[in-house]
Regions:
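Gly/Ser/Thr-enriched, mixed-charge loops and adjacent short helices
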Residues: 2, 15, 103-230
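N-terminal small/polar loop signature for handling phosphorylated ligands or for N-terminal nucleophile
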Residues: 30, 34, 40-102, 189-248
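Phosphate-binding and adjacent anionic-ligand microenvironments
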Residues: 234, 272-453
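An N-terminal, well-structured beta->alpha segment
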Residues: 1-65, 142-173
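Short glycine-centered, acidic/aromatic-flanked micro-motifs in structured strand/loop junctions
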Residues: 43-45, 175-177, 249, 331, ...
Length: 453
């Protein structure tokens, strides 16, 4: 297969109006539209460049002969829901958790799943090596709008949990939408669930003034403090496009995405008497332990929600997700879904009648460390090859090269993988003690440093 030149793990992400210009976006959209030749939905997150890019991709799609349905500014999973149910494809303008200067284009097929490699290569071939279809004047597409999708998405989310039971509990919830697209959904869903809601950063703003879009612990100190000050049952945080949720327990503890995944996995397997769970090679051993206990089967893919989603579809999987808090409920949407995650977590709190900290404490215990190190994109492949060679030649550790280099030791593992959207390597480690996890992650970083210079 030819090497892709534009698409990364999550579509195309670049600095807005630098590399990701209107001209670039329009031609790429025209290339995509030339293949789809149908009705394409578009929408995006709250970034300052999103309206500019939406207009550009609209022009490109119309030029190729596609009709366009503009869904507005809304969460990525709401757009995926709309495409899966009504349209032939979609383009989502988002850079998810990346800093404000970035934006991106995420292309999805008629199921709302990120397009497979062969289609992305076909789009790139049209973009670079030939010309997109340019419709004759009487075949140019038409623009429509659909402003009802958010309400429909919220209603469909609520259908999938026991609303009355959650309402009866009157949970006290603090939600931090990070000024992103979740601002249009999360507060309303929580109110429909009868929660006493306190909002932080729930005014949409593409400059993300309250915090960085990535919901990692250093960025959520205001949320943590508010949960403790108010005596809330739970704190919730979204990334920029609201396709993932991070939880804070009632004591103000940051709950790793793996733990949230494990909680929901356990509940889903209990409710369905087992099933296929799809995750990535970077996910905790706890996911495997729970599957074994509750009749599940785990399938691992490379990192990327579209890979997990496609495997869920191909295997008729029950549930899936990633370690970053992006959980996929395939009977609803083939992609990470912050709103559905929130609703399900609240339902678990109510059904189990236990605080979040206690539910987390009941899960299998592993310790993790997550580090990252800068590395130019053009060196990444060479660095990975040299790391793999060193491990093979100097140790007897097991290697998994599904995505990057995963080194499996008797007391844990470390995965060293290149980011698909940034010039960095991420090193995730897990072990039976925090000290060992820290050591393994630092070792992974040292291997990258050794071979990038």
């Amino acid at each position: 297969m030819a090497e892709k030149r534009l698409f990364g793990t999550f579509g195309v992400r670049r600095t807005a109006n630098d590399v990701l210009t209107p001209e670039f976006a329009s031609r790429l959209a025209a290339s995509y539209g030339s293949i789809v030749q149908g009705t394409v939905a578009i929408g995006g997150d709250t970034r300052t460049s999103t309206p500019m890019l939406k207009h550009a991709i609209t022009a490109g799609l119309l030029s190729s002969g596609c009709d366009v349905v503009d869904l507005g500014i809304l969460p990525t999973p709401a757009i995926q829901y709309a495409v899966r149910n009504y349209y032939d494809g979609g383009i989502i303008v988002t850079a998810s958790h990346n800093p404000p200067k970035y934006n991106g284009l995420k292309f999805v097929d008629e199921f709302g799943i990120g397009n497979p490699d062969d289609m992305e290569l076909e789009v790139e071939k049209l973009y670079f090596d030939s010309e997109p279809n340019r419709a004759s004047w009487d075949k140019i597409g038409t623009v429509y709008t659909n402003e009802s999708i958010i309400k429909e998405y919220i209603a469909e989310t609520l259908k999938r949990v026991d609303v009355e039971a959650i309402r009866a509990r009157k949970l006290k919830v603090v939600v931090d939408c990070g000024s992103g697209a979740g601002s249009y959904t999360a507060p309303y869903i929580l109110k429909e669930l009868g929660c006493e809601v306190t909002t932080l950063n729930c005014q949409a703003d593409g400059f993300f003034p309250g915090r960085d879009p990535e919901p990692i612990e250093p960025n959520l100190q205001d949320l943590i403090a508010t949960v403790k000050d108010l005596g809330a049952d739970i704190g919730l945080a979204h990334d920029g496009d609201a396709d993932r949720t991070i939880c804070i327990d009632e004591k103000g503890n940051f709950v790793l995405g793996d733990k949230t995944f494990a909680l929901v996995e356990k509940q889903m397997l209990k409710e369905n008497d087992g099933g296929i769970i799809v995750t990535t090679v970077a996910t905790s051993q706890a996911i495997y332990d729970i599957a074994e206990e509750y009749g599940g089967e785990v399938i691992a893919t490379a990192v990327g929600d579209l890979l997990v989603a496609r495997k869920l579809k191909d295997t008729d999987g029950l549930f899936g997700g990633e370690e970053n808090g992006g959980l996929i409920f395939p009977d609803f949407i083939y992609g990470g879904d912050a709103a559905m995650t929130v609703a399900k977590i609240l339902e678990i709190l109510v059904k189990e009648d236990k605080p979040l900290s206690e539910l987390v404490a009941e899960l299998p215990v592993y310790y993790q460390e997550k580090l990252k190190v800068e590395c130019p994109d053009d060196l990444k492949q060479d660095v990975m090859s040299k790391i793999a060679d060193e491990i093979k030649e100097t140790t007897d550790f097991e290697l998994d090269t599904t995505d990057g280099v995963k080194i499996l030791k008797e007391d844990g593992w470390v995965i060293i993988r290149p980011s698909g959207t940034e010039p960095i390597f991420r090193c995730f480690a897990e072990s039976d003690s925090q000290e060992k996890a820290d050591e393994m992650a630092s070792w992974g970083i040292s291997l990258v440093e050794k071979y990038k210079n």
